[in-house]
């Protein structure tokens, strides 16, 4: 069985002070929105809704931004777990483009938020590399690259990668 992200301990989790809530729930207050789950999705949703003027109540059973969010490598990129070739095949080229546009906008929002609030989180822009180890994976990488381009995300095939491992084909 594959371990879920929340089962892993991230590099940064051991060095972060425990978050203790500063506010208690005001049971007499009427909230516009109740958000269940204090991972990156819940916290981001609360942040954006509050910026829009809504009163939000964020509920988390354990610790904010731990669990699945805490166990990730925190890489943010435009290449999703489900490749654009799959999105295109199951839905359409138009839907694949819409997903790519949404993902690019999400990356921009994250980057802008980091810079706006001067968040010291090691954020940097870098490239991602997909690689193929077998002939079957090479064929799949061709499809992924073409669909990624069709979706509006630039990528290209390269001959070398920054780690000393030989692969049959790479795409960046």
Language-model segments: residues:
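Glycine-rich active-site loop/strand segments that organize a redox cofactor
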Residues: 72-102
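Flavin (FAD/FMN) cofactor-binding and adjacent substrate-gating region
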Residues: 2-14, 82-88, 112-172
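N-terminal Rossmann-like FAD-binding beta1-loop-alpha1 element of flavoenzymes
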Residues: 29-58
